[in-house]
Amino acid sequence: MKKSLIAAAVVAALPAFAQAQTNVTMYGIVDASVNVIDLGDNSRNALIIGHGTQSTSRWGVRGSEDLGGGLKAVFQLEAGIANDTGAHDAQFFQRTAQVGLQGGFGTIKIGRGYTPAFRMHGTWDALSYGLFNNLLTATVPIAAGGADTAVTRFSNGIYYDSPSFGGITVNAAYASGETTDEALERSAGEGWDISIGYKGGPLHIGGYYEQTKDAVANETERFGIGGGYDFGAFRLVAGYSEREEDGFDKYSAASIGGVMKLGTGSIHAQVIRLGNDNLPDADATAFALAYVHPLSKRTNLYAHFGTTRNDDNGTFGMRTGAESFLADAPGSDVKGFGVGIRHVF
């Protein structure tokens, strides 16, 4: 009830706030789909009304204040919406909650936001973190059927984005574990990562390294490298990412994909080889095919198909922008197809 009242108060205040501060913008995405999902031989096919399928449904406010001398104050607050039920995230501004400074030195922000690793990983995704078997299939946690090759967000974080130096950019982040218990290591709960990218003409390449520690300071390392080339009517992307944890063998994801223009729309295709070295015959191959058709600059329709074919002991699933679909048993294949609409405001 408290969260509902807070949300209502924030929304009610936005028009007056935006009028008083013309550099404040309210924005959002509403994305809905109708899908048929098959989780394997031990489950029946199901009709799923999806939310956030191409892009996670959300609303937010962002803005800036000119402080003079080329310096700006910037902020962003963003909340997720499950528009199939009307529910919102348990943490109200779970997606982004940041404030910082921007200038010739780059941008420094404090709060909760996307990690440089996650942002870099998405640059070699042919489906831009949306639709069946986008690269979230690789980055989501193992319990959600993924390979956990990049942490999506840090809380309690400090973020730095550099300006471009001849097409080269550097992004870094540190998250405090805020550990005060003397019985625990100081580094418990911490995380940090760095990404370096280059973009020049039709070529973009980049990589990242990430290290996180759990509540008892067990360490997990992640890295990735990839890029793409835009030929005009066709864009090719490819990459490799890996996760390794203390006491466990690695998980990995190798992908190749492409985007081809077709009239006013575009065809997207991608193949991901998902690896699990902890068990024999536990890998999987994920495939995606989609068509996106714009109706305007802000509204588009889409149709998509995806399948994840697990080896005998594989438990990998399939992911859209906001939802994970898990195999019903080791070795089961997951597949689905559907259509949807996305509106950006």
Positions of PLM-derived features:
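Gram-negative bacterial Sec-dependent N-terminal signal peptides
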Residues: 1-20
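Residues that define the transmembrane beta-barrel architecture of outer-membrane proteins
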Residues: 4, 45-57, 92-95, 152-156, ...
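Outer-membrane beta-barrel channels and translocator barrels
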Residues: 15, 21, 66-68, 104-106, ...
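Outer membrane beta-barrel
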Residues: 21-36, 46-177, 188, 197-201, ...
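Transmembrane beta-strands of outer-membrane beta-barrel proteins
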Residues: 24-32, 69, 73-77, 108, ...
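Outer-membrane beta-barrel "beta-signal"
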Residues: 165, 329-345
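Detector for outer-membrane/organellar transmembrane beta-barrel domains
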Residues: 187, 191-294, 304-307
